[in-house]
Each structure stands twice: as structure tokens, then as C-alpha cells.
Regions:
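Actinobacteria-biased recognition of intrinsically disordered, low-complexity terminal regions
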Residues: 1-4, 11
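A short glycine-rich, His/Asp/Glu-containing loop-to-beta-strand
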Residues: 8-42, 47, 96
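Short, charged/polar surface micro-motifs in flexible loops or helix N-caps
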Residues: 26-27, 35-38, 57-59, 66, ...
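Glycine- and acidic-residue-biased ligand/ion/polar-headgroup-sensing regions
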Residues: 46-58, 63
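Short acidic-glycine-tyrosine-enriched beta hairpin
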Residues: 50, 64-82
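Ligand-binding loop in jelly-roll beta-barrel domains
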Residues: 79-104
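Acidic/histidine-enriched, glycine/proline-rich intrinsically disordered or flexible terminal extensions
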Residues: 104-130
Length: 130
């Protein structure tokens, strides 16, 4: 059974408790990003992914819930958790990706025909769910 997403609120919203945030694997990249993810719920079967909101906010949708996060918040989505997100107005954020996810995004952004997205996701051990 896949793990659960970890939502770390901004420092101003944090309680005294803390949650451990860690990703398996031996390398990752951090990119500053704007814009939304794919509109469909999707899952990365072997790769973790994380976002840290610098400005504005993001709206994350999971299989059973939708959560808005604001500047200063971090969201960690372990491999196997279905998710997508929408960038709220004026959002600016960091996304933490494995090399495989970075390659998936690059191939999706260069694809001329969206009809082939299912196959592209499969090649990168990911899957569109909607």
C-alpha cells in the first residue's frame, strides 16, 4: 500500500510536533517552477516528488482529498500516491524531482500529440489515472 502525502505547513502554522520528511534514492534535482501540473490524477510508481511554495499557493488533489498550501509550506508525495496540483494566482515554488521525473516532464513538454501521454508515463514508471 502506498504511503501518504506529507503536508508540512509554513513555519507560522506549525505546531510543536514535526514530521520526518525523507526520500529514497541517490539523486534529485530542485527547480524553481511556475504553473500547474497535469490536470489528471497520476501516480509515479517508483519516484517521490516534493514541492516547497515560495510565493502564493498550490492546490493539491489526491484520491480522497484536496488541500491548499501557502507560501512556506512543503508537500512531499511518496511513490505510489495518486496526485495532481494546480498553481494558484502568483504562485512560485520549488519542485524536487528524481532524474526520471525530470526526463518525464521534458518528454511530455516536447510531445506534439497529447494522445501519446499514457505511453510516455508508462516508460517512466508512472501512470495517468483519469
Amino acid at each position: 500500500m502506498p504511503g501518504q502525502p506529507i503536508i508540512a505547513p509554513s513555519q507560522a502554522e506549525r505546531a510543536d510536533q514535526s514530521q520526518r520528511m525523507a526520500a529514497d534514492g541517490d539523486s534529485f534535482a530542485i527547480h524553481e517552477w511556475k504553473g500547474s501540473g497535469p490536470p489528471q490524477l497520476h501516480v509515479h510508481h517508483e519516484d517521490d516528488e516534493a514541492w516547497h511554495v515560495l510565493e502564493g499557493g498550490l492546490r493539491f488533489r489526491f484520491a480522497d482529498q484536496t488541500i491548499d498550501v501557502n507560501a512556506g509550506s512543503t508537500v512531499f508525495v511518496p511513490a505510489g500516491v495518486a496526485h495532481t496540483y494546480v498553481s494558484l494566482p502568483d504562485a512560485r515554488y520549488l519542485v524536487v524531482l528524481t532524474p526520471r521525473l525530470r526526463e518525464l516532464i521534458a518528454e511530455l513538454s516536447s510531445a506534439a500529440d497529447r494522445a501519446g501521454d499514457d505511453e510516455i508515463y508508462r516508460r517512466y514508471r508512472s501512470e495517468l489515472l483519469e
